Every structure is written in structure tokens, then in C-alpha cells.
From Swiss-Prot:
Name listed for the protein in its UniProt record: Large ribosomal subunit protein bL28
NCBIfam families: L28 (TIGR00009)
Cross-referenced HAMAP family: Ribosomal_bL28
Extent of Basic residues compositional bias: 33-42
Tree of life domain: Bacteria
Family: Belongs to the bacterial ribosomal protein bL28 family.
Species annotation: Halothermothrix orenii (strain H 168 / OCM 544 / DSM 9562)
GO terms, molecular function: structural constituent of ribosome
Record gene name: rpmB
Length: 76
């Protein structure tokens, strides 16, 4: 099963997790320094929804942004 919205195509994105050390400048230190970056994945907020597709009810994966904006016609 893919983690992709079937309406807008939003999927997983690669991002960095940044590890810092040191004391912040506003707290009287010399500033934060990056010691390590590691890759991580940001996943979309998907919901399985029964929606009307081509006039028939079908269960699809939709991101919550499409659901809130009204791009999906729900079938109850």
C-alpha cells in the first residue's frame, strides 16, 4: 500500500533531523552548533475514506487537507 493521496498526489518527503549542541546566544552562549544530520521521512496525514468516484462509492486514501477543503465527496 502506497502512502500517497489519491486526489492531490501528496506523498512521503525526505527531510533532515538536525542534532545541535551548545548554549544559545540569547542565553549567553556562543551559539548552537550542528553535530549531526540524519535523514528521515515525513509522511502525509492520510485517511481511508469512502468517497464517490465516477458515480460509485469507493474506499480511497485521502490526505486530510483535501478532506477539509471539500475536494472529496463523501459516501456515507
Amino acid at each position: 500500500m502506497s502512502r500517497v493521496c489519491e486526489i492531490c498526489g501528496k506523498g512521503t518527503v525526505k527531510a533532515n533531523r538536525i542534532t545541535r549542541r551548545g548554549k544559545a546566544k540569547k542565553e549567553g552562549g556562543v551559539g548552537k552548533h550542528i553535530t549531526k544530520t540524519s535523514r528521515r521521512r515525513q509522511k502525509p496525514n492520510l485517511v481511508k475514506v469512502k468517497a464517490i468516484v465516477d458515480g460509485r462509492p469507493k474506499r480511497i486514501k485521502v490526505c486530510t487537507k483535501c478532506l477539509k477543503s471539500g475536494r472529496v465527496e463523501r459516501a456515507y
